[in-house]
């Protein structure tokens, strides 16, 4: 959530910055609500001052033995007026809060201004795409003989679900273990196991609600009269970041660096017809997430560090990639700045997103009321960052395509072999004669 004081000080400036993000701020509606809020607040304060004055007058009159009934009646009337004004003020503030909850973060000044992904800026590349001396297959054709089973996944749960069997399932698990081990043993993160179902207020904290309710899977428990609504997480960023919700941490505890391997659940509303083949866009997929909670002055150094941590995974796997700076119009709702990592997929002859690393500055912290004690001992909002390290399913796709062989086998990347019992290659099972 944006700081409402920022809008009060420079409403037109904030509106311009939000317009760069493709969001139209209703300046007239905000101004009208603010004017009404100020008027009611001023009236309430005047009533409070009048009641305080009359209360002192009543005390003085009682000391003199004078009749206070008329003054007390006026005090009673003021009390009724104050209750009505406070109720109205609460209503106005709730409407302002609803308006604020729907506003995206403002972009950092270093973010390129643009409308969509066509205006993103490539920062750098690593690795050289492999030159194949045979016809390249996509991950579906490579993986299906090795245990990638879309038919059973669809039978069990419908479209955009996948079943993994045998060595492919083991390779998928190996990738996640390798990522977690790298982040905990080399990058300083604490491994965390989180709930996969969370309460609605948790999603408000990280910005998925109210705007992206249609993208979430909702679950309900209890009978018809006692239904409790919860949500399946779309990323473990949600639960990891909210661990500091409604708390004040000591500055000495920062940075807090957490990582988790979890399934992620997304309805993919609005993506009908996109990436319908294979594992690129799924309703359920695994991801290793990185989250950092830091002091404001260190958050952009932390963002660069986090991008480096995601890059390290790709480099160790030997997968070519590029780093993209997202423009204002392509960033996620909560982000102030985002870098995407895109891995090379030879069958598509292009780079595809495999990680997104973002600094949300104080946007999520303000929604969560997550603070730390600064050098002056005063509570101050932390900055929160999140990044994929990496999306496990898409990494599996990249390994299958980049490490495929002419005979249909897949070479296991060296760093994964300890997790695969020393296996160097995945071969299709022999066909019964």
Swiss-Prot record:
GO terms for molecular function: ATP binding; serine-tRNA ligase activity. Pathway: Aminoacyl-tRNA biosynthesis; selenocysteinyl-tRNA(Sec) biosynthesis; L-seryl-tRNA(Sec) from L-serine and tRNA(Sec): step 1/1. It comes from the Bacteria. L-serine binds at residues 235-237, 289, 388. Disulfide bonds: none annotated. It is an enzyme of class 6 (ligase). ATP binds at residues 266-268, 353-356. One of its GO terms (biological process) is selenocysteine biosynthetic process. It is found in: Cytoplasm. Its EC number is 6.1.1.11. Keywords: Aminoacyl-tRNA synthetase, ATP-binding, Cytoplasm, Ligase, Nucleotide-binding, Protein biosynthesis. Its main location: cytoplasm. The keyword Nucleotidyltransferase does not apply. It holds the Pfam family tRNA-synt_2b. GO terms for cellular component: cytoplasm. Belongs to the class-II aminoacyl-tRNA synthetase family. Type-1 seryl-tRNA synthetase subfamily. Consists of two distinct domains, a catalytic core and a N-terminal extension that is involved in tRNA binding. Homodimer. The tRNA molecule binds across the dimer. NCBIfam families: serS (TIGR00414). This is Serine--tRNA ligase.
């Amino acid at each position: 959530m944006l700081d409402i004081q920022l809008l009060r000080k420079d409403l037109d400036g904030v509106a311009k910055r939000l317009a760069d993000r493709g969001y139209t701020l209703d300046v007239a509606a905000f101004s009208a609500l603010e004017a009404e809020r100020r008027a009611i607040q001023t009236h309430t304060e005047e009533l409070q001052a009048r009641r305080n004055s009359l209360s002192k007058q009543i005390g003085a009159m009682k000391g003199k033995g004078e009749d206070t009934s008329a003054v007390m009646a006026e005090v009673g009337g003021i009390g009724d007026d104050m209750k009505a004004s406070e109720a109205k003020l609460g209503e106005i503030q709730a409407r302002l809060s609803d308006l604020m909850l729907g506003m995206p973060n403002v972009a950092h000044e270093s973010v390129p201004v643009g409308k969509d992904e066509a205006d993103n800026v490539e920062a750098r590349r690593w690795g050289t795409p492999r030159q194949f001396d045979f016809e390249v297959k996509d991950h579906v054709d490579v993986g299906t003989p090795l245990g990638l089973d879309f038919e059973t996944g669809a039978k069990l749960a419908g479209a955009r679900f996948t079943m993994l069997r045998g060595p492919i399932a083991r390779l998928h698990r190996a990738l996640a273990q390798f990522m977690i081990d790298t982040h905990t043993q080399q990058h300083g993160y604490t491994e965390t196991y989180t709930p996969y179902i969370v309460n609605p207020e948790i999603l408000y904290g990280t910005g998925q609600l109210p705007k992206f309710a249609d993208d979430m899977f909702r679950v309900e428990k209890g009978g018809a009269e006692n239904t409790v609504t919860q949500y399946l997480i779309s990323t473990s960023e949600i639960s990891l970041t909210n661990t500091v919700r409604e708390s004040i941490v000591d500055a000495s505890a920062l940075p807090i660096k957490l990582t988790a391997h979890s399934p992620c659940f997304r309805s993919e509303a609005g993506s009908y017809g996109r990436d319908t083949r294979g594992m690129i866009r799924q309703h359920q997929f695994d991801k290793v997430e990185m989250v950092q909670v830091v002091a404001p002055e260190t958050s952009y150094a932390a963002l660069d560090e986090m991008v480096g941590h995601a890059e390290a995974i790709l480099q160790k796997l030997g997968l070519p990639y590029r780093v993209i700076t997202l423009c204002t119009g392509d960033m996620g709702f909560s982000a102030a700045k985002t870098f995407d990592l895109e891995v090379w997929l030879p069958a598509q002859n292009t780079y595809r997103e495999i990680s997104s690393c973002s600094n949300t500055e104080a946007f999520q912290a303000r929604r969560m009321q997550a603070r730390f004690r600064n050098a002056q001992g005063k509570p101050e909002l932390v900055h929160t960052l999140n990044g994929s390290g990496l999306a496990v399913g898409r990494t599996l796709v990249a390994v299958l395509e980049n490490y495929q062989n002419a005979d249909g086998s897949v070479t296991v990347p060296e760093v994964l072999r300890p997790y695969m019992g020393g296996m160097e290659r995945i071969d299709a099972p022999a066909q019964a004669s």
